[in-house]
Amino acid sequence: KDDEWWKGRRVWLGLDLSLSEDNVCVDMKTYEGDDKDNAVLYTKTMGFIPAGKIAQKSKREGVDYNTLIRNGCCIACGDEVIDYTKVEEYVLTLEEKLGVEIVQIGYDRWNAISSIQKFENAGYECVEIKQHSSVLHSPTKWLKECILSGRYWYEENLMLEINFQNARCTEDTNKNKYVNKKKSVEKVDQVVGNINSTYLIEQELLYGGDGFVAQVG
C-alpha cells in the first residue's frame, strides 16, 4: 500500500520501545471488516536503530541494516543509543503526513513513560498493554490466524519479515501462547509492536470502542 491509501483511515499504533540501545518499533495498523472472523488487517511498520551501532549490529545479527534504511524499513537516529525524540516526532507527525486518525496508542510500560506523556499531552489516548501471556495470548493467536488465512497485509518490509522469522512462541501453564523475547532468535520488536496494535483492534471489534479494555492477569 502506498501512503495515499492510508488517507482518511482510523489507525491504532503498537509500540515496542524496549531499551534505548536496542531496536524500537512503531507499528501502525487499520482494518476492514465487522468482526474478528472476517476482519482484514493492514499494517505499516517502522523500525528505529542507533545510528552509531549500524556496523556492529549488522555484523552481530547478520542483517544488512544499511539496506533496510535505504529501503525505508527503519530509521537510524542517535549514536550509541536511540534518540527517542525522533521516535516521538515520527508518531506525532503521522496524522499530518498520512492523513490518518490515530485512535489509540498501545505500549508496554517499560522505558515508555516519557514518550507516552508527550503523546498524552498531544491529546492521544494511550493504553498500557500488560506484557503477560494472559493478555497477549488472544491477539497473538488472532494475528497468526489472520496471517495464515491471507487477512494480513503489510507494506513490503524485509525487516518485518526477518523479525517474524526470529519470533518464537512459548506456552504458559494455561496453554496460552505468547512471543518469548528471551527464547526468540535475535530481534522481534516489530512482532511485538504488531501484537500490541492487534490487541487494540481486537478490543475495538469485541467491545465497539466504548473505552472498555479487558486485561486479565
Predicted regions and their residues:
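A polyampholytic, Gly/Pro-enriched intrinsically disordered region
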Residues: 146-162
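RNase H-like, metal-dependent nuclease domains and their acidic two-metal-ion catalytic environment used
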Residues: 1-131, 137, 141, 158-217
